[in-house]
Structures are given as C-alpha cells and as structure tokens.
Amino acid sequence: MAVDGSVTLELKNISKYFGSVVANKGVDLTLHKGEILALLGENGSGKTTLMNMISGIYYPDEGQIFVNGREVSIASPQDAFRYKIGMVHQHFKLIDLFTAAQNIVLGIKGRYNIKRINEEVKDIADRYGFAIDPKKKIYDMSVSEKQTVEIIKVLYRGADILILDEPTAVLTPQETEKLFSVMRAMKADGKSIIIITHKLREVMEISDRVAVLRKGEYIGCVNT
C-alpha cells in the first residue's frame, strides 16, 4: 500500500503523435506519494514515450500534467528536475573516465568541492542501501553499479518522483533483489516511483499498483 494517499503526479488526457503514428492517446494516470507504480505493456505500447513526456524529453501534443495538484509545463529535463522528477533510462549517460561522484554532479552549475560531494553521495548511498564507492571510476564498475550511479544522480538533484525504465533488464536475479530492496527503502522515505516493465512477476513482487498500456492507450489500473 502507498505510504500517503496524496496524489503527487497526475496525467490527464495525454497524447503524443509522431507524424501519423499515435504513440499515446488520451492517457490518464495518477501516482501517489510513497507509492511504487508499475507501468506494464508490451514493446511499442507507449510506456517509455509517456514517461519521456513526464521527464521532459518529449512534450505532449494534448493533455495536462499536474505535480502536487498544480498544472505544470515540462519542456526539458531541467523543467522536470525543477518539479523534483528524475528518470533513469535504460542506456546510461556516464563518462567512463570520471568517478561516480563526478558523474553525479556533472551539469550542475557552480564550483565543486569534491570532498564534500563524495560525502554527500555516500550519505545518499547509506540512506537507501546502495553499495557504491563515490571515488570509483565508471570504467571499473559493473552494470549494476553504473545503474546505481544514475539513480543516485537523480536523488542528488532532489527527485521525489523517480522513473525507472526497464531497470532489471541488465541485472542478474541477485542484483534485481538488491534493487528492489533499495526501491522499498526509497518508498519508505516518501519517494514515489514508476517502474516501466513487461515482466509480470516483478510487477507482483515490487509494485503497489500496476497500470497497463496497449497500443498507446491506457487500459486500466489495479492494486497488486
């Protein structure tokens, strides 16, 4: 069950077209504070396109987005972060020669105190149970460690709403269980999480509710 009944994110009648292709059509969706919501659908169902509109990669052609009851316009990832929304994509955007901490603050304006940043990254890791060395170079990391850096990156920027796009696709079963443990810790801390997946077993294990998309349209949502 969700920690809090308040709606933190709401989509109303969201549509997106690419020429004659309908990616999403009239989608309604709600996410509550402290909830893990699974977004389920086959490949090409519009899951990632929908989440890309929430995270500022695409802009909806129709519909409204509300964050904490307020209508917002999200035209860029910077806008999304302004509303405390962060998305972790399947393909990581990290610089191999940089450390975890350097990647996490990359793009943030201002001077860096790397010692302080290392400490802040470690604090976030300890808070949610991540296993990561802030000083470790990306080229020395496993795939799961790289994913951890991407998740901490959005948490460092203050995200309260996290979108994870097929996060288990690159993980072993043991790494998946560790990720789910971290997700439960974030949920307990009041974070709201959307996990994009097509794996029903994982939906039943980790989510509070599951919303189903098919051919770009919202089919329904049920408690899990």
Model-derived features: positions:
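Glycine-rich phosphate-binding loops of nucleotide-dependent enzymes
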Residues: 2-224
